[in-house]
């Protein structure tokens, strides 16, 4: 079944998590952030947008998006996985002002890109500490794809992670905890067939 989802790619002001405006749902690994920070320092570039969700019970923003995406898109292509991407560019100042007003009091929930977001914060701080930027410069912002949390095309795919080297890790205790909420099936075979 083909799905379709619409959102906004926007320049979003970076906020510390403590402010409760942009919210994470997972912890990050320092090694991945270090790599990304070094890449940003070397290139002064933001290579990949963050994916964030917002709540809009009236779906007013989605109505605006639908209205702005009636004409032929500025760009359309199908990627190697068969996903078609369409991009419309909004230049009408009134529409932009309306969209900005829509988000004035909204929280954003990071769906994908926790490492990138934290790296963007670290990069902004690095630039300020080293006199490379001031408040309002580009490093105060991050490219984020914003999607209505109740969009009918929203699909959340599973993420499979391998956990290892945890101190005092007890596999049976973890599996017992999982059995409270899930059906747990033991798989036999070599590691490659299971992972």
Mark where each language-model region is:
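Surface-exposed, charge/polar-rich loops and edge strands
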Residues: 1-195
């Amino acid at each position: 079944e083909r799905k379709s989802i619409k959102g906004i790619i926007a320049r979003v002001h970076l906020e510390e998590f403590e402010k409760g405006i942009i919210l994470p749902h997972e912890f990050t690994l320092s090694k991945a952030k270090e790599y990304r920070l070094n890449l940003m320092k070397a290139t002064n570039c933001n290579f990949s947008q963050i994916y964030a969700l917002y709540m809009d019970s009236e779906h007013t923003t989605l109505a605006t998006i639908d209205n702005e995406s009636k004409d032929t898109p500025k760009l359309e292509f199908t990627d190697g996985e068969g996903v078609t991407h369409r991009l419309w560019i909004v230049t009408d100042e009134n529409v932009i002002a309306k969209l900005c007003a829509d988000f004035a009091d909204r929280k954003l929930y990071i769906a994908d890109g926790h490492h990138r977001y934290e790296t963007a914060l670290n990069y902004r701080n690095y630039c300020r500490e080293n006199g490379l930027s001031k408040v309002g410069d580009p490093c105060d912002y991050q490219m984020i794809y914003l999607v209505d949390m109740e969009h009918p095309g929203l699909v959340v795919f599973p993420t499979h992670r391998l956990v290892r080297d945890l101190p005092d890790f007890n596999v049976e205790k973890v599996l017992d905890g999982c059995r409270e909420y899930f059906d747990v099936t033991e798989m036999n075979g070599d590691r490659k067939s299971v992972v």
